[in-house]
Amino acid sequence: MNATSLRQWAKTGDSATARMLWRAAKALRYGSVPCIPAIHGPLYALNGALKNGFGFIVRTVWTTPLFQSRLEQPAERLYLYGGMPLVLGPVKISMGSDVRLSGHTTISGKPTSHPAPRLEIGNNVGIGWQTTIAVGSRIVLGDNVRIAGRAFLAGYPGHPLDAADRAAGKPCTSNQTGDIILEKDV
């Protein structure tokens, strides 16, 4: 009897052994040690301190410098949180100071653009979690711009509108590509 059939037998069986085995398995799954606040409170605080300390070291020593190397010039006081953004394609990125950028952000440049697509991010800009910025030719985010999580700025669609061209694997056409400019304080 393999593990799957044993599980099914214990879950649906009518015998006392099957019911007892299923109750024991559920008790193990939901089991826990009783909480002792004097012990578990400090352990919880230690867990948070270790996690935050390790995250700080990884962010300052690893992810921020690596991402800065992808920029045209390093950005002052760049704050990456939650990892490193995914950058795809030949996009050129310039960034002002005091930018907060989620590590779960995707920045892509249209592969067939010439010259290379440009993403210009001003000062004091916040870009939220799971935001996608698809740069067709140029996207400008002015100073003090806030972009919520899961936003999508589409400067190009990534495929042609014509079904035959799409099926042939052709790239999107130049008339489908546009600039996106979010002025200051948007």
Regions found by a protein language model. Give the residues of each.
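Domain-scale signature associated with acetyltransferase and cell-envelope carbohydrate enzymes
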Residues: 1-160, 176-185
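Short glycine/proline- and charge-enriched loop/turn segments
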Residues: 161-173
